[in-house]
Each structure stands twice: as C-alpha cells, then as structure tokens.
C-alpha cells in the first residue's frame, strides 16, 4: 500500500499533507513531520540531470534529503545525524521573509549591472539574453540583509550550539547567480579551504524557491565516510604547486591557474557507482537550511529553465579556537589569487 500511494501522490501533495498534520504519525513511512526521506518513491519525480548526465532514478541510487525539522532544537541528535549523514537539512528553519529580503537586495544589484531582463519583475531573476552571470562574490560585500542573515542571528546561533563553543566564520561569501546550463561538478570542499581546521562546515543557502528544474544542491549519501576512496584527493590544495616544476610555476604563479581544479569527476553517475549510496536532493524553499562537512561529496543539478537564475551562497563556519585558512579572512581575503598560492618542493 505505501508504494502504491506514493506512486499516485505527487511529492508536493505529500509535503502539503505533512504541513497540515505535522504531529500526526501516519501509517505510511514517507509521511511524518515532513521527513519524506528514503521510503518515498522516486517514480513521481522528474528526470534529474547533473553536469549534462541523467541520473539513475532508481530508489537505491537516488533519494530525498533527510529533513531534520523534527530535531531542530536537539543538538545532541543533530550531531548524531551529522556524523551519520554528513549533512543536516532543516526545512523552513530560517525566517522566509529575511531570506527574501536578502534576495531582493541581490537581484537589485544584478539589475543595476544590467544582468536581469527589464520585461520581468526583478524578484523573478530572469536573465537578459547574453548577460554575464555566474559567480558573484563581490555582490555579497556590503549587502546588509545577506550579511545579517548569514553572520548573525539564527545561522550563527546554530553553529554556536552545534560546536558548543564560540565560533567564527570566513570573511568571504561565495555568492552565485547561475543561469541555464550545467551545474557544479562532484567535489569536496576541503581542497579549496584546508589550510586550517578540517572540522569547519559549509552552509548552502537558497535565496528563493529552487525546483528540480532550476537545480539545487545534491549530496552523495555516505560519501564522507569513504576516506579509502578520497585519501588521494581530499588533502590536496588547489593553490599548491611544485616550485621545482617549471610547468606548474607557469600555470599557477604566472598564469594564476590551479595545479589541479579540485574536481572529483565530470560524471556524477560514475561517482555514485564508485562510492555507492544515493544522490540526494530536494526542492528547496527560501528559509531552508543545509549544512555539511568538508569530506562530503556534493554537486548541483543543472539549471534546465529557459532564462531563470538560481541564486545561492556558500558560507563557512568553524570553532573559534581552531586554526583558520588564511585565504578566506580579512577585509579583502586573498582567496585563490596570487597571495593565496603556496609553493612546495616536490
């Protein structure tokens, strides 16, 4: 019976039922307090595409993120789930209006740069044909509602309680307004920010509702535990290079490139076949909260819309007592620029 009903009911209807009766324990395992994780059939979902590859939608290869709204204030349980899953996703954890306030300021900045189509409301984030969009970290600077959302209030309170001590955050915000096309390749975050502690966490923030078509983040289930497969990748530094290798010196120092890109693969299905587990995602809404660690393999879905921008950010948090990666602190963090490069004798 559960499989039959989950096939008939759409994903959205099941979410609606959970919202109407958040405290009721239904006899069907996919419908309890919005926790519609693995028992839900994937037969009703659209075909998911990541980096140009169609994902296998079989229930043993694809699923929905675990919603931890039922444990939002139980940090002992959240730590347990983080250790088990490698991530924490809490639907509706943040005030939707505050997230949309940040979106409003972001789209105003995009509009001022001539990126948005003037025939549509700015809040719709419809890209003008031919406009340059994508990685926009500079737009996070001085964006008061975004800075307040990410670096004060409920977000920082979460990490303070999760770590059970004082925290600090990176001074750099990875803001993106991604148009139609391929999503982000499978990767882990540590190769880009591993010079300090390895216990820091990423917060991925959607600034608006993100359908499967618009393309949100996806994570590879259990990948944070596969150190056997990650050991030759995870501890590399994208800004490191061999001083005694003339080709690397030219590529990294002279040309400002990377000795390696930090990409794990260009093929999400192949990564899943190698690591096992399932690719997990959901349809995100403004106010949703997703955080994960440095060893978790993740990627993003392709933006399959005609002209809409998917607006999101990455921000990072850690214990204040632990060392921090110098590339991401200060009024003007050096990042992956010339001052962020590190030469080694290989």
Enumerate the predicted regions with their spans.
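Extreme N-terminal basic, low-complexity initiation segments
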Residues: 1-9
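Catalytic core of non-heme Fe(II) oxygenases with the double-stranded beta-helix
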Residues: 157, 182-281, 322-329
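Non-heme Fe(II)/2-oxoglutarate
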Residues: 41-68, 101, 116-118, 232-238, ...
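Cationic, low-complexity basic patches in intrinsically disordered or flexible, solvent-exposed regions
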Residues: 20
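Non-heme Fe(II)-dependent double-stranded beta-helix
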Residues: 41-85, 91-186, 192-195, 334-346
């Amino acid at each position: 019976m559960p499989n039959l009903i989950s096939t008939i009911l759409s994903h959205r209807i099941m979410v609606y039922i959970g919202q109407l009766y958040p405290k009721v324990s239904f006899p069907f395992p996919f419908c309890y307090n919005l926790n519609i994780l693995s028992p839900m059939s994937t037969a009703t979902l659209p075909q998911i595409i990541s980096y140009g590859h169609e994902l296998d939608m079989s229930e043993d290869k694809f699923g929905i993120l675990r919603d931890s709204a039922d444990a939002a204030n139980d940090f002992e349980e959240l730590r347990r789930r983080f250790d088990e899953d490698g991530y924490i996703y809490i639907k509706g954890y943040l005030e939707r209006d505050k997230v949309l306030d940040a979106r409003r300021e972001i789209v105003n900045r995009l509009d001022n740069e001539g990126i948005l189509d003037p025939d549509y409301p700015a809040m719709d984030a419809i890209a003008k044909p031919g406009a340059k969009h994508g990685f926009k970290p500079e737009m996070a600077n001085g964006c008061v509602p975004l800075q307040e959302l990410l670096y004060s209030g409920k977000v920082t309170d979460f990490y303070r309680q999760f770590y059970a001590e004082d925290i600090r955050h990176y001074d750099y915000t990875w803001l993106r307004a991604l148009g139609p096309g391929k999503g982000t390749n499978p990767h882990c975050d540590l190769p880009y920010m591993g010079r300090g502690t390895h216990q820091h966490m990423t917060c991925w923030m959607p600034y608006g509702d993100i359908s499967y078509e618009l393309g949100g983040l996806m994570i590879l289930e259990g990948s944070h535990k596969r150190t056997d497969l990650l050991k030759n990748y995870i501890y590399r530094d994208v800004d490191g290079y061999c001083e005694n290798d003339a080709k690397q010196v030219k590529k990294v120092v002279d040309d400002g490139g990377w000795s390696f890109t930090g990409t794990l693969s260009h093929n999400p299905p192949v990564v899943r076949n190698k690591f096992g587990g399932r690719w997990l995602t959901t349809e995100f809404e403004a106010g949703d909260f997703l955080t994960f660690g440095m060893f978790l393999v993740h990627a993003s879905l392709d933006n399959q819309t005609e002209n809409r921008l998917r607006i999101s950010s990455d921000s990072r948090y850690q214990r204040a007592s632990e060392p921090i990666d110098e590339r991401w602190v200060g009024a003007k963090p050096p990042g992956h620029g010339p001052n962020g490069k590190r030469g080694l004798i290989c």
